Amino acid sequence: MPLVYADSSALFAYLHPRDEFSTLVDAAVREDSPDFVYWSWLRFELRHNLRMTRTDSDGEVAWQALRAAEKTAARFRWQGELTADKMLDAAEELSGERARTIDCGSGDYLHVAAARRLNLLSGIDEFWTCDAAQAALASATGLPTRLFQLKHAPGKTAAG
C-alpha cells in the first residue's frame, strides 16, 4: 500500500460524506488504497474539525469513522518520529526558505514540513491536499503532490 501524507482537508473529505471534495478523495482512496500518515498535529486538527461538525448525522458518522480508524489503525499509520517540537522547528525553517514566495498559512507550512521530513526519513508516495497554495508549497519542496480540485467554483465545505 502506498503511504500518503494527506493534510486535514483531504482527510476530512475522506471521512465526511458531505464535504465538497468527498467524491474526489473517496475515488482516489478506492483507486490507490493508501495508508495515511498520522501524527499528533494532524490528529488534533482533524479531530477538532470533525468535532465542529457533530451537529448532524453526517458529522456524527464522520466522527465515528475517525474513531474506528484510530482504534484499529485501519488506514492511519502513526508516525512517532514526527514530534510537535521537531516539526515546528522544521516548519520554521521551511517558512524562512519559502514564505516570501509561497503564500500559505502556518498550518500549511507545518503539514508540508512534516511530509518533507517523513519523505527524507522513510519516503512517502504522495502528498494530498484540497488547498492549491499548499499544493504549490509541497510541489516546490519536491514532494509528489496531488491536488483535489472541483470543476465548479468552490463553496463552503462542511468543515467551514
Features from the language model and the residues they span:
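Short, well-structured N-terminal submotif of metal-dependent ribonuclease cores
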Residues: 1-42, 52-64, 153-160
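Acidic, PIN/NYN-like endoribonuclease modules and their adjacent C-terminal/linker elements
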Residues: 1-3, 39, 112, 117-160
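A general structural signal for well-ordered alpha-helical segments in protein cores
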Residues: 22, 43, 66, 88, ...
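Conserved phosphoryl-transfer catalytic core
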Residues: 46
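Helix-adjacent hinge/juxtasegments
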Residues: 52-85
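Active-site neighborhoods of divalent-metal-dependent phosphate/nucleic-acid chemistry enzymes
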Residues: 76-133
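Short, mixed-charge aromatic SLiMs
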Residues: 33-37, 67-76, 134-143
